[in-house]
Protein backbone atom coordinates (compact mmCIF):
# COMPACT_ATOMS: atom_id res chain seq x y z
CA UNK A 1 0.00 0.00 0.00
CA UNK A 2 1.60 3.34 -0.98
CA UNK A 3 2.34 5.85 1.73
CA UNK A 4 -0.45 8.29 2.41
CA UNK A 5 0.71 11.93 2.41
CA UNK A 6 0.42 13.60 5.74
CA UNK A 7 -0.32 17.26 5.14
CA UNK A 8 0.31 19.86 7.82
CA UNK A 9 -2.10 22.74 7.27
CA UNK A 10 -3.65 25.64 9.06
CA UNK A 11 -7.35 26.17 8.48
CA UNK A 12 -8.20 29.83 9.04
CA UNK A 13 -11.78 30.34 10.10
CA UNK A 14 -13.77 33.49 9.35
CA UNK A 15 -13.65 36.27 11.92
CA UNK A 16 -17.39 36.14 12.49
CA UNK A 17 -19.31 33.36 14.25
CA UNK A 18 -20.54 30.21 12.56
CA UNK A 19 -24.24 29.34 12.76
CA UNK A 20 -25.45 26.30 14.63
CA UNK A 21 -26.21 23.58 12.09
CA UNK A 22 -29.54 22.65 13.62
CA UNK A 23 -30.74 26.22 13.10
CA UNK A 24 -30.62 25.62 9.38
CA UNK A 25 -28.53 28.75 8.81
CA UNK A 26 -26.18 28.29 5.83
CA UNK A 27 -24.03 31.42 5.93
CA UNK A 28 -20.74 29.78 6.97
CA UNK A 29 -21.63 26.12 6.86
CA UNK A 30 -19.26 25.62 3.92
CA UNK A 31 -16.31 26.46 6.14
CA UNK A 32 -17.31 23.89 8.74
CA UNK A 33 -18.05 21.44 5.97
CA UNK A 34 -14.59 21.93 4.47
CA UNK A 35 -12.91 21.43 7.84
CA UNK A 36 -14.74 18.14 8.37
CA UNK A 37 -14.06 17.11 4.79
CA UNK A 38 -10.33 17.69 5.23
CA UNK A 39 -9.88 16.10 8.64
CA UNK A 40 -12.88 13.83 9.32
CA UNK A 41 -13.50 12.04 6.03
CA UNK A 42 -16.79 13.81 5.35
CA UNK A 43 -17.97 12.57 1.96
CA UNK A 44 -17.39 15.06 -0.84
CA UNK A 45 -20.68 14.08 -2.43
CA UNK A 46 -22.70 14.89 0.66
CA UNK A 47 -24.85 18.02 0.58
CA UNK A 48 -25.25 20.12 3.71
CA UNK A 49 -28.75 21.17 2.71
CA UNK A 50 -29.97 17.55 2.70
CA UNK A 51 -31.26 15.96 5.89
CA UNK A 52 -28.76 13.12 5.52
CA UNK A 53 -25.94 15.61 5.00
CA UNK A 54 -26.86 17.46 8.19
CA UNK A 55 -26.92 14.21 10.15
CA UNK A 56 -23.54 13.13 8.82
CA UNK A 57 -22.07 16.56 9.57
CA UNK A 58 -23.37 16.42 13.14
CA UNK A 59 -21.81 12.97 13.60
CA UNK A 60 -18.45 14.22 12.29
CA UNK A 61 -18.66 17.20 14.63
CA UNK A 62 -19.20 14.81 17.53
CA UNK A 63 -16.08 12.89 16.50
CA UNK A 64 -14.09 16.10 16.34
CA UNK A 65 -15.38 17.27 19.72
CA UNK A 66 -14.52 13.98 21.35
CA UNK A 67 -10.94 14.04 20.02
CA UNK A 68 -10.39 17.62 21.14
CA UNK A 69 -11.87 17.03 24.59
CA UNK A 70 -14.83 19.33 23.98
CA UNK A 71 -18.43 18.97 25.07
CA UNK A 72 -19.94 16.52 22.58
CA UNK A 73 -23.00 18.25 21.11
CA UNK A 74 -22.87 17.67 17.36
CA UNK A 75 -23.30 21.44 16.98
CA UNK A 76 -20.79 24.00 15.73
CA UNK A 77 -20.96 25.82 19.06
CA UNK A 78 -18.54 28.62 20.01
CA UNK A 79 -16.12 26.29 21.82
CA UNK A 80 -15.95 24.00 18.79
CA UNK A 81 -15.46 26.93 16.44
CA UNK A 82 -12.62 28.26 18.56
CA UNK A 83 -10.90 24.88 18.29
CA UNK A 84 -11.37 24.96 14.52
CA UNK A 85 -9.69 28.35 14.32
CA UNK A 86 -6.50 27.17 15.99
CA UNK A 87 -3.46 26.27 13.87
CA UNK A 88 -3.41 22.53 13.37
CA UNK A 89 -1.75 19.67 11.57
CA UNK A 90 -3.45 18.71 8.33
CA UNK A 91 -3.35 14.97 8.92
CA UNK A 92 -6.93 13.60 9.02
CA UNK A 93 -8.06 12.63 12.50
CA UNK A 94 -10.29 9.64 11.73
CA UNK A 95 -10.23 6.40 9.73
CA UNK A 96 -9.35 5.42 7.10
CA UNK A 97 -6.53 7.96 6.96
CA UNK A 98 -5.46 8.61 10.55
CA UNK A 99 -5.50 4.96 11.65
CA UNK A 100 -2.68 3.81 9.43
CA UNK A 101 -3.21 0.52 7.62
CA UNK A 102 -1.50 -2.35 9.44
CA UNK A 103 0.38 0.23 11.55
CA UNK A 104 3.13 1.06 9.02
CA UNK A 105 6.49 1.18 10.75
CA UNK A 106 10.13 0.96 9.82
CA UNK A 107 11.44 -2.60 9.90
CA UNK A 108 14.94 -1.51 10.94
CA UNK A 109 16.05 0.47 13.96
CA UNK A 110 18.96 2.41 12.45
CA UNK A 111 17.67 5.07 10.08
CA UNK A 112 19.54 7.67 8.10
CA UNK A 113 18.41 11.16 7.21
CA UNK A 114 19.57 13.86 4.84
CA UNK A 115 18.87 17.58 4.61
CA UNK A 116 18.40 18.60 0.98
CA UNK A 117 18.30 22.39 1.38
CA UNK A 118 17.59 25.19 3.84
CA UNK A 119 15.24 28.04 4.73
CA UNK A 120 16.63 31.58 4.24
CA UNK A 121 15.24 32.64 7.63
CA UNK A 122 17.65 30.58 9.73
CA UNK A 123 21.34 29.79 9.50
CA UNK A 124 22.35 26.31 8.38
CA UNK A 125 23.68 25.59 11.85
CA UNK A 126 20.36 26.47 13.51
CA UNK A 127 18.40 24.38 10.98
CA UNK A 128 20.67 21.38 11.46
CA UNK A 129 20.50 21.70 15.23
CA UNK A 130 16.68 21.96 15.24
CA UNK A 131 16.36 18.88 13.04
CA UNK A 132 18.89 16.88 15.07
CA UNK A 133 17.04 17.76 18.30
CA UNK A 134 13.75 16.69 16.71
CA UNK A 135 15.19 13.28 15.87
CA UNK A 136 16.52 12.93 19.43
CA UNK A 137 12.99 13.43 20.75
CA UNK A 138 12.18 9.98 19.34
CA UNK A 139 15.55 8.24 19.71
CA UNK A 140 15.62 9.06 23.44
CA UNK A 141 12.61 6.82 24.10
CA UNK A 142 12.96 4.02 21.52
CA UNK A 143 15.63 1.67 20.13
CA UNK A 144 15.69 3.88 17.02
CA UNK A 145 18.93 5.62 16.09
CA UNK A 146 19.27 8.32 13.46
CA UNK A 147 22.39 9.29 11.55
CA UNK A 148 22.74 12.13 9.10
CA UNK A 149 24.29 11.19 5.73
CA UNK A 150 25.74 13.55 3.14
CA UNK A 151 26.69 11.64 0.00
CA UNK A 152 23.39 9.84 -0.58
CA UNK A 153 19.71 10.21 0.23
CA UNK A 154 18.76 9.11 3.70
CA UNK A 155 15.80 6.95 4.63
CA UNK A 156 14.16 10.23 5.65
CA UNK A 157 14.80 13.26 3.44
CA UNK A 158 13.96 16.71 4.78
CA UNK A 159 13.63 19.51 2.22
CA UNK A 160 12.18 22.96 1.60
CA UNK A 161 10.01 23.56 -1.48
CA UNK A 162 7.99 26.27 -3.16
CA UNK A 163 4.69 25.76 -5.01
CA UNK A 164 4.25 22.59 -7.06
CA UNK A 165 7.16 20.34 -6.11
CA UNK A 166 6.15 17.04 -7.69
CA UNK A 167 4.16 15.20 -5.02
CA UNK A 168 0.68 16.52 -5.93
CA UNK A 169 0.54 18.61 -2.75
CA UNK A 170 1.33 22.15 -3.80
CA UNK A 171 2.51 24.82 -1.40
CA UNK A 172 0.91 28.23 -1.88
CA UNK A 173 2.89 30.37 0.54
CA UNK A 174 -0.08 30.76 2.87
CA UNK A 175 -0.12 29.73 6.51
CA UNK A 176 -2.81 27.14 5.77
CA UNK A 177 -0.36 24.55 4.46
CA UNK A 178 3.23 24.89 5.60
CA UNK A 179 4.61 21.33 5.70
CA UNK A 180 3.76 17.72 5.05
CA UNK A 181 5.27 14.28 5.58
CA UNK A 182 4.80 10.69 4.48
CA UNK A 183 4.31 7.45 6.38
CA UNK A 184 7.18 4.91 6.60
CA UNK A 185 8.01 3.21 3.35
CA UNK A 186 10.06 3.32 0.16
CA UNK A 187 10.28 6.27 -2.19
CA UNK A 188 8.74 9.29 -0.50
CA UNK A 189 8.06 7.25 2.63
CA UNK A 190 9.12 9.11 5.77
CA UNK A 191 10.11 12.29 3.92
CA UNK A 192 9.31 15.72 5.32
CA UNK A 193 8.59 18.73 3.10
CA UNK A 194 8.51 22.32 4.34
CA UNK A 195 7.08 25.37 2.56
CA UNK A 196 10.08 27.49 1.58
CA UNK A 197 7.96 30.66 1.64
CA UNK A 198 7.09 30.34 5.33
CA UNK A 199 9.08 32.10 8.04
CA UNK A 200 10.73 29.30 10.02
CA UNK A 201 12.04 30.28 13.43
CA UNK A 202 13.77 29.02 16.55
CA UNK A 203 11.40 30.89 18.86
CA UNK A 204 7.66 31.50 19.38
CA UNK A 205 7.13 33.47 16.18
CA UNK A 206 5.52 31.97 13.07
CA UNK A 207 6.52 28.29 12.82
CA UNK A 208 9.10 26.81 15.18
CA UNK A 209 11.23 24.47 13.07
CA UNK A 210 12.14 22.12 15.92
CA UNK A 211 8.56 21.63 17.07
CA UNK A 212 7.07 21.18 13.59
CA UNK A 213 9.85 18.74 12.68
CA UNK A 214 9.38 16.69 15.86
CA UNK A 215 5.63 16.45 15.17
CA UNK A 216 6.18 15.56 11.50
CA UNK A 217 8.75 12.91 12.38
CA UNK A 218 6.13 11.31 14.60
CA UNK A 219 4.09 10.80 11.43
CA UNK A 220 7.22 9.73 9.51
CA UNK A 221 7.66 6.97 12.10
CA UNK A 222 4.03 5.83 11.82
CA UNK A 223 2.08 7.77 14.45
CA UNK A 224 -1.37 9.27 13.93
CA UNK A 225 -2.85 12.04 16.07
CA UNK A 226 -3.41 11.90 19.81
CA UNK A 227 -6.44 13.09 21.79
CA UNK A 228 -4.17 14.25 24.63
CA UNK A 229 -3.97 18.02 24.25
CA UNK A 230 -0.59 18.06 26.02
CA UNK A 231 0.90 15.57 23.55
CA UNK A 232 3.26 16.50 20.74
CA UNK A 233 0.98 14.56 18.37
CA UNK A 234 -2.17 16.50 19.30
CA UNK A 235 -3.68 17.97 16.10
CA UNK A 236 -3.46 21.64 17.09
CA UNK A 237 -0.14 23.40 16.61
CA UNK A 238 1.14 25.15 19.73
CA UNK A 239 4.65 26.04 20.79
CA UNK A 240 6.08 27.95 23.72
CA UNK A 241 9.70 28.83 24.23
CA UNK A 242 10.51 26.36 26.97
CA UNK A 243 12.51 23.23 27.63
CA UNK A 244 10.59 20.62 25.61
CA UNK A 245 9.69 17.32 27.27
CA UNK A 246 7.95 14.54 25.33
CA UNK A 247 4.53 13.71 26.74
CA UNK A 248 3.94 10.24 28.20
CA UNK A 249 1.16 9.62 25.68
CA UNK A 250 3.63 10.16 22.82
CA UNK A 251 6.11 7.85 24.55
CA UNK A 252 3.53 5.10 25.04
CA UNK A 253 2.37 5.24 21.43
CA UNK A 254 5.82 5.27 19.81
CA UNK A 255 6.98 2.46 22.11
CA UNK A 256 3.93 0.43 21.05
CA UNK A 257 5.45 0.49 17.55
CA UNK A 258 9.16 0.12 18.32
CA UNK A 259 9.56 -0.80 21.98
CA UNK A 260 11.37 1.14 24.74
CA UNK A 261 14.90 2.45 24.63
CA UNK A 262 17.49 -0.14 25.71
CA UNK A 263 19.28 2.68 27.56
CA UNK A 264 16.56 4.77 29.15
CA UNK A 265 17.64 8.20 30.27
CA UNK A 266 17.48 8.78 34.01
CA UNK A 267 17.20 12.55 34.24
CA UNK A 268 16.97 12.41 38.02
CA UNK A 269 20.63 11.47 38.42
CA UNK A 270 22.28 13.73 40.99
CA UNK A 271 25.10 14.57 38.58
CA UNK A 272 22.57 16.37 36.39
CA UNK A 273 21.69 19.09 38.86
CA UNK A 274 23.23 22.09 37.08
CA UNK A 275 22.79 24.28 40.16
CA UNK A 276 24.90 22.03 42.38
CA UNK A 277 27.54 24.49 43.59
CA UNK A 278 30.21 21.79 43.72
CA UNK A 279 29.60 20.44 40.22
CA UNK A 280 32.68 19.93 38.03
CA UNK A 281 32.88 18.84 34.40
CA UNK A 282 34.99 16.50 32.30
CA UNK A 283 35.14 18.90 29.34
CA UNK A 284 33.57 22.19 28.24
CA UNK A 285 33.32 23.45 24.65
CA UNK A 286 31.63 26.04 22.50
CA UNK A 287 29.78 24.71 19.47
CA UNK A 288 27.79 26.76 16.97
CA UNK A 289 27.31 29.51 19.50
CA UNK A 290 26.26 27.19 22.33
CA UNK A 291 28.28 26.25 25.40
CA UNK A 292 28.28 22.51 26.14
CA UNK A 293 29.33 20.95 29.45
CA UNK A 294 30.22 17.23 29.53
CA UNK A 295 29.78 15.20 32.69
CA UNK A 296 30.06 11.39 32.81
CA UNK A 297 27.58 10.09 30.19
CA UNK A 298 25.62 13.33 30.00
CA UNK A 299 26.06 16.76 28.53
CA UNK A 300 24.37 20.07 29.32
CA UNK A 301 23.70 22.60 26.57
CA UNK A 302 23.42 26.33 27.22
CA UNK A 303 21.51 28.00 24.38
CA UNK A 304 21.08 31.75 24.41
CA UNK A 305 17.41 31.77 23.44
CA UNK A 306 16.33 29.18 26.04
CA UNK A 307 15.79 30.14 29.69
CA UNK A 308 17.09 26.84 31.06
CA UNK A 309 19.86 24.45 29.97
CA UNK A 310 19.08 21.24 28.07
CA UNK A 311 20.33 17.87 29.30
CA UNK A 312 21.11 15.02 26.92
CA UNK A 313 23.05 11.75 26.73
CA UNK A 314 26.43 11.62 24.99
CA UNK A 315 25.90 8.13 23.54
CA UNK A 316 22.70 9.18 21.80
CA UNK A 317 24.39 12.07 20.00
CA UNK A 318 27.91 10.71 19.53
CA UNK A 319 27.59 6.91 19.82
CA UNK A 320 31.19 6.26 18.71
CA UNK A 321 32.93 8.40 21.31
CA UNK A 322 34.39 7.18 24.60
CA UNK A 323 32.93 8.37 27.87
CA UNK A 324 34.51 10.81 30.34
CA UNK A 325 36.69 12.93 28.06
CA UNK A 326 39.83 14.64 29.32
CA UNK A 327 39.30 17.67 27.07
CA UNK A 328 37.55 18.88 23.92
CA UNK A 329 37.44 21.93 21.65
CA UNK A 330 35.75 23.34 18.56
CA UNK A 331 38.00 24.00 15.54
CA UNK A 332 37.19 27.53 14.42
CA UNK A 333 35.71 27.90 10.96
CA UNK A 334 35.44 24.23 9.95
CA UNK A 335 32.49 22.94 12.03
CA UNK A 336 34.61 20.24 13.64
CA UNK A 337 34.97 19.07 17.24
CA UNK A 338 37.93 17.23 18.73
CA UNK A 339 37.68 15.09 21.84
CA UNK A 340 40.59 13.81 23.91
CA UNK A 341 40.97 10.83 26.18
CA UNK A 342 44.42 9.72 27.24
CA UNK A 343 46.78 9.97 24.29
CA UNK A 344 43.98 9.65 21.70
CA UNK A 345 42.04 12.28 19.78
CA UNK A 346 38.69 11.86 18.00
CA UNK A 347 37.70 14.33 15.25
CA UNK A 348 33.93 14.70 14.81
CA UNK A 349 31.61 16.43 12.36
CA UNK A 350 27.92 16.37 13.18
CA UNK A 351 27.43 12.97 14.87
CA UNK A 352 30.13 11.19 12.91
CA UNK A 353 33.72 10.37 13.87
CA UNK A 354 35.90 11.20 10.88
CA UNK A 355 37.66 8.42 9.01
CA UNK A 356 41.02 7.45 10.46
CA UNK A 357 40.21 8.49 14.02
CA UNK A 358 41.02 8.04 16.84
CA UNK A 359 44.66 8.98 16.35
CA UNK A 360 47.60 9.42 18.70
CA UNK A 361 48.07 13.04 19.78
CA UNK A 362 51.80 12.65 19.13
CA UNK A 363 51.35 11.79 15.45
CA UNK A 364 48.41 14.12 14.77
CA UNK A 365 49.57 17.27 16.60
CA UNK A 366 53.29 16.62 17.12
CA UNK A 367 53.33 16.34 20.91
CA UNK A 368 56.44 14.77 22.46
CA UNK A 369 56.10 11.22 23.70
CA UNK A 370 56.04 12.29 27.36
CA UNK A 371 52.68 14.12 26.85
CA UNK A 372 50.11 11.38 27.38
CA UNK A 373 46.95 13.40 28.02
CA UNK A 374 45.50 16.90 27.51
CA UNK A 375 43.97 18.85 30.41
CA UNK A 376 42.21 21.52 28.34
CA UNK A 377 42.16 22.99 24.83
CA UNK A 378 40.70 25.99 23.03
CA UNK A 379 40.98 27.30 19.45
CA UNK A 380 41.37 31.09 19.26
CA UNK A 381 38.79 32.39 16.80
CA UNK A 382 40.78 35.25 15.27
CA UNK A 383 44.09 33.45 14.74
CA UNK A 384 43.14 29.81 14.25
CA UNK A 385 45.70 28.91 16.93
CA UNK A 386 44.80 26.13 19.35
CA UNK A 387 46.12 26.27 22.91
CA UNK A 388 46.74 22.96 24.69
CA UNK A 389 47.12 23.07 28.48
CA UNK A 390 49.06 20.27 30.18
CA UNK A 391 49.94 20.60 33.87
CA UNK A 392 51.64 24.02 34.27
CA UNK A 393 52.65 24.32 30.59
CA UNK A 394 50.88 25.05 27.34
CA UNK A 395 51.50 24.38 23.66
CA UNK A 396 50.21 26.38 20.68
CA UNK A 397 49.17 24.63 17.47
CA UNK A 398 48.50 26.29 14.10
CA UNK A 399 45.33 24.79 12.59
CA UNK A 400 46.17 26.26 9.17
CA UNK A 401 49.69 24.84 8.83
CA UNK A 402 48.84 21.82 11.00
CA UNK A 403 52.00 22.19 13.01
CA UNK A 404 53.12 23.27 16.47
CA UNK A 405 54.36 26.84 16.75
CA UNK A 406 58.07 27.12 17.59
CA UNK A 407 59.07 28.20 21.08
CA UNK A 408 56.56 26.05 22.93
CA UNK A 409 55.74 24.76 25.50
CA UNK A 410 55.63 27.85 27.71
CA UNK A 411 54.58 28.46 31.30
CA UNK A 412 50.86 29.11 31.68
CA UNK A 413 51.31 31.57 34.55
CA UNK A 414 53.84 33.60 32.57
CA UNK A 415 51.58 34.30 29.59
CA UNK A 416 48.25 34.16 31.43
CA UNK A 417 48.89 36.09 34.69
CA UNK A 418 46.74 34.83 37.53
CA UNK A 419 46.19 31.38 36.01
CA UNK A 420 48.63 29.62 38.33
CA UNK A 421 46.72 26.38 38.88
CA UNK A 422 45.81 23.35 36.85
CA UNK A 423 43.45 24.26 34.00
CA UNK A 424 40.55 21.81 33.91
CA UNK A 425 38.76 23.38 30.92
CA UNK A 426 38.93 26.50 28.78
CA UNK A 427 36.64 28.13 26.21
CA UNK A 428 36.54 31.41 24.31
CA UNK A 429 33.59 33.81 24.32
CA UNK A 430 34.15 37.09 22.44
CA UNK A 431 37.47 38.59 23.62
CA UNK A 432 37.79 36.40 26.70
CA UNK A 433 39.17 33.02 27.60
CA UNK A 434 37.20 31.38 30.40
CA UNK A 435 39.49 29.18 32.49
CA UNK A 436 37.81 26.57 34.68
CA UNK A 437 39.35 25.11 37.82
CA UNK A 438 37.20 22.76 39.87
CA UNK A 439 33.83 24.57 40.27
CA UNK A 440 35.16 28.11 39.65
CA UNK A 441 35.62 29.98 36.37
CA UNK A 442 38.00 32.87 35.68
CA UNK A 443 37.42 35.31 32.85
CA UNK A 444 40.70 36.28 31.23
CA UNK A 445 40.57 39.34 28.95
CA UNK A 446 42.72 38.65 25.88
CA UNK A 447 43.29 42.36 25.24
CA UNK A 448 44.33 43.46 28.73
CA UNK A 449 45.91 40.05 29.50
CA UNK A 450 44.33 40.09 32.96
CA UNK A 451 41.65 38.23 34.90
CA UNK A 452 38.71 40.62 35.22
CA UNK A 453 36.08 38.36 36.81
CA UNK A 454 35.59 35.06 38.63
CA UNK A 455 32.41 33.18 39.53
CA UNK A 456 30.87 29.76 40.06
CA UNK A 457 30.49 27.61 36.95
CA UNK A 458 26.75 27.31 37.52
CA UNK A 459 26.23 30.97 36.66
CA UNK A 460 26.01 29.66 33.08
CA UNK A 461 22.80 27.88 34.11
CA UNK A 462 20.94 30.90 35.50
CA UNK A 463 21.15 29.48 39.01
Swiss-Prot record:
Q: Name one GO biological process term.
A: collagen catabolic process
Name the residue ranges of motif: Cysteine switch: 87-94
Q: Where are the Hemopexin repeats?
A: 278-321, 322-368, 371-419, 420-463
Q: Which residues form the propeptide?
A: 18-96
Which of this chain's residues are annotated to bind Ca(2+) 2? 155, 187, 189
> Which residues does the annotation flag as glycosylated?
370
Its keywords, alphabetically, are: Autocatalytic cleavage, Calcium, Collagen degradation, Disulfide bond, Extracellular matrix, Glycoprotein, Hydrolase, Metal-binding, Metalloprotease, Protease, Repeat, Secreted, Signal, Zinc, Zymogen
Cofactor(s) demanded? Ca(2+); Zn(2+)
Q: Where is this region: Metalloprotease?
A: 95-273
- Residue sites binding Ca(2+) 3 per the record: 172-173, 195
Q: What class of enzyme is it?
A: hydrolase
Q: Name one GO cellular component term.
A: extracellular region
Q: Which Gene3D superfamilies match?
A: Collagenase (Catalytic Domain), Hemopexin-like domain
Residues binding Zn(2+) 2 are: 89, 215, 219, 225
What UniProt notes about the protein's domains is:
The conserved cysteine present in the cysteine-switch motif binds the catalytic zinc ion, thus inhibiting the enzyme. The dissociation of the cysteine from the zinc ion upon the activation-peptide release activates the enzyme.
Give the family, as the similarity comment puts it.
Belongs to the peptidase M10A family.
Q: What protein name is recorded for this chain?
A: Interstitial collagenase B
Amino acid sequence: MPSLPLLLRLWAASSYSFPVIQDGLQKNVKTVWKYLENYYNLGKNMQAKNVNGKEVMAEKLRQMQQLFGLKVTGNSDPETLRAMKKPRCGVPDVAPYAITHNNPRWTKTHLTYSILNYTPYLSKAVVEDAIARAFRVWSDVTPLTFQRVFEEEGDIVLSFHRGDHGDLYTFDGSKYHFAHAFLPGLGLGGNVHYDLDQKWTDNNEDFNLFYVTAHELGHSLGLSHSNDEEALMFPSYTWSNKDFVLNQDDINRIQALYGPSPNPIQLTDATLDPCNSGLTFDAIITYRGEVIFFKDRFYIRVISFLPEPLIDVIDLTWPNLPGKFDAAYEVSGVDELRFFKGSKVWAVQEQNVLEGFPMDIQSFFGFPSNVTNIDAAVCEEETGKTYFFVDHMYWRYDENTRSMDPGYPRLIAEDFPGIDYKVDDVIQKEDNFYFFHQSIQYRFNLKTRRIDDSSDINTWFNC
